[in-house]
């Protein structure tokens, strides 16, 4: 086992960039699509726990976009369609039983848009494959169910496994709504997710429409950031300034883009190794 640390770098007018460090493995890093600054006052340690470096190292999935390397995507798929750096960071942290928290500016919003791990089903299959290759044990569903204080990653896993028996099967967006409600209750138990469920559904519909437009790169980034700005305003009005700031990590009225300026060229662009958009 080795210590896995989730870090956040502040970016002006944008959600924090997140990455994962493993000091016990010779100061190895999972950069999560970008090139984070690892020094200076603008980085914050968000979480830290013991996990498996070999398992995380198995699914780095760096991608080559026309000669530019986007490192350590965690196989989440297509940037801005399946997730952003926050989802990749959570994938690298999963064996440590922790996730990013709402201390990360803008993380709550990317959770609403993409979930904790991007496409849970796609990531879980890759995670099991890498766990098997590394000889790591994955707890059975029954072991999770009887745990007194199951970790948030295990609660998310249980949520998705329980949905497998539903008829008709819930849509991907419905699962994102349920997952975000679970995570919100975990980190802010006094905030009722029912207060924003309808707005969450509207956000997902607007995000899907932007993706279905066929735009890519800077144009898609601009469209998604505009959707984010619109719904940030609506959510702040519904929840109130104090609650909104607790969840978003920024004051109401402060715009937080979800697509990083330095990663716009990857937005919506499929490359070998990218996963499809996700389950319906």
Locate the predicted segments by residue.
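Non-catalytic ligand/cofactor/substrate-binding and regulatory segments of enzyme domains
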Residues: 1-162
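Charge-rich (acidic/polar
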Residues: 149-280
């Amino acid at each position: 086992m080795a210590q896995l640390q989730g870090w956040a770098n502040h970016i002006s007018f944008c959600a924090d960039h997140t990455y994962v460090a493993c000091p016990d493995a010779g100061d190895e890093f999972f950069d999560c699509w970008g090139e984070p600054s690892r020094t200076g006052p603008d980085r914050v340690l968000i979480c830290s726990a013991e996990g498996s470096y070999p398992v995380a190292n198995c699914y780095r999935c760096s991608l080559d976009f026309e000669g530019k390397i986007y490192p350590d995507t965690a196989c989440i798929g297509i940037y801005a369609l399946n997730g952003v750096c926050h989802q990749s960071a959570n994938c690298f942290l999963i064996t440590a039983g922790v996730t990013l928290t709402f201390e990360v500016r803008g993380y709550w919003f990317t959770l609403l848009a993409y979930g904790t791990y991007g496409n849970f089903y796609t990531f879980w299959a890759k995670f099991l494959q890498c766990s098997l290759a590394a000889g790591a044990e994955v707890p059975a569903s029954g072991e999770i169910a009887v745990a007194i204080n199951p970790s948030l990653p295990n609660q998310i896993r249980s949520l998705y496994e329980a949905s497998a028996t539903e008829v008709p099967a819930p849509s991907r967006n419905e699962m994102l709504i349920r997952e975000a409600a679970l995570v919100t209750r975990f980190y802010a138990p006094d905030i009722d997710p029912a207060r924003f469920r309808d707005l969450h559904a509207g956000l997902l519909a607007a995000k899907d429409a932007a993706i279905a437009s066929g735009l890519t790169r800077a144009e898609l980034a601009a469209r998604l950031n505009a959707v984010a700005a619109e719904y940030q305003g609506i959510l702040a009005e519904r929840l109130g300034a104090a609650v909104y700031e607790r969840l978003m990590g920024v004051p109401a009225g402060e715009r937080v883009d979800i697509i990083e300026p330095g990663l716009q060229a990857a937005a919506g662009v499929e490359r070998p190794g990218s996963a499809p958009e996700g389950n319906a």
